[in-house]
Amino acid sequence: GYSSASKIIFGSGTRLSIRP
Protein backbone atom coordinates (compact mmCIF):
# COMPACT_ATOMS: atom_id res chain seq x y z
CA GLY A 1 0.00 0.00 0.00
CA TYR A 2 2.34 2.79 1.24
CA SER A 3 5.31 1.02 -0.30
CA SER A 4 5.43 3.24 -3.37
CA ALA A 5 4.66 6.32 -1.30
CA SER A 6 7.42 5.51 1.18
CA LYS A 7 9.96 5.61 -1.64
CA ILE A 8 8.92 9.17 -2.45
CA ILE A 9 8.47 10.42 1.10
CA PHE A 10 11.33 8.44 2.63
CA GLY A 11 14.42 7.94 0.50
CA SER A 12 15.35 4.88 2.55
CA GLY A 13 11.76 3.69 2.26
CA THR A 14 12.81 1.58 -0.71
CA ARG A 15 13.32 -1.25 1.75
CA LEU A 16 9.67 -0.93 2.71
CA SER A 17 8.72 -1.62 -0.88
CA ILE A 18 8.27 -5.26 0.10
CA ARG A 19 5.44 -4.18 2.35
CA PRO A 20 1.81 -4.18 1.08
UniProtKB/Swiss-Prot annotation:
Any one Gene Ontology BP term: adaptive immune response
The organism's place on the tree of life at top rank: Eukaryota
GO cellular component: a single term: T cell receptor complex
Keywords: Adaptive immunity, Cell membrane, Immunity, Membrane, Receptor, T cell receptor
Subcellular location: Cell membrane
Protein task: J region of the variable domain of T cell receptor (TR) alpha chain that participates in the antigen recognition. Alpha-beta T cell receptors are antigen specific receptors which are essential to the immune response and are present on the cell surface of T lymphocytes. Recognize peptide-major histocompatibility (MH) (pMH) complexes that are displayed by antigen presenting cells (APC), a prerequisite for efficient T cell adaptive immunity against pathogens.
Quaternary organization: Alpha-beta TR is a heterodimer composed of an alpha and beta chain; disulfide-linked. The alpha-beta TR is associated with the transmembrane signaling CD3 coreceptor proteins to form the TR-CD3 (TcR or TCR). The assembly of alpha-beta TR heterodimers with CD3 occurs in the endoplasmic reticulum where a single alpha-beta TR heterodimer associates with one CD3D-CD3E heterodimer, one CD3G-CD3E heterodimer and one CD247 homodimer forming a stable octameric structure. CD3D-CD3E and CD3G-CD3E heterodimers preferentially associate with TR alpha and TR beta chains, respectively.
Name this polypeptide is given: T cell receptor alpha joining 3
Protein encoded by which gene: TRAJ3
